[in-house]
Amino acid sequence: QCLHRLLNENIIPDIVTIVDGEKILYNDFKGIKNSLLKQMILLANVNVDSKILNLFTNKNLFLYEKEFLIKSNISKYLEGFTVGETTYQIFLMLGFREIYLVGTDMSIDETSGKTHDEMHKYSSKNRVNTNKKLSYRKKSKINQNKDVLTVEGNFTKNVLTTTFYSRLINNYNRITLKYKMNEQEVYNMSDGAKLKDIKPYSKIKRFYKYKLIDKNKLHKKLIKLFTETSENKFENNEKQM
């Protein structure tokens, strides 16, 4: 759904990341021109359906291992639950110097109770009762998608979130602590939950001053980076697994 949202804003991403292996995700690519997909680099979990992989050019296709490791010499365990944390960890591990997080709010719209953007196909209709604050003194069961918590905000003092989002926040914080190097800067442009050691960033007008990026040169640099940190064959001991 994120890809459709970007294309609707006339943004063609250089990289697309997929975590889930469900075949139904193939439907998310319907309506997208094949010529556009051929321009993009795909970072895909090894369990992603082959119909999706075939939408992309082979030279732009890079697989990573998440649930289990076969190529332990180059693979590391990826700790994210969702595609957001997974992509974030990969970019940190690859040494990207500046990372800007967009749409990483992990909070509830306090007016409407929405948990997802309208563009989200499966969760856009989700609503929570923002008055239903969770008390840990209660011994009742916790509904991770409905019960509400108050956490520190990125641009405001506090925001409301769900216990599910709280898990994701903790996951981002753990990944940052474990993989972020001193020379890396990470900025959160989302009006939502605060993430540790990640700087709030709202100066969007500053981007208008940046020089236009030569997308062809960038594509070649990214392909070179991913190729140098990848392998395209199995060793004998790996074939036996």
Which positions does each model-derived feature cover?
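Metal-ion/cofactor- or nucleotide/acyl-coenzyme-handling active-site neighborhoods
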Residues: 2-241
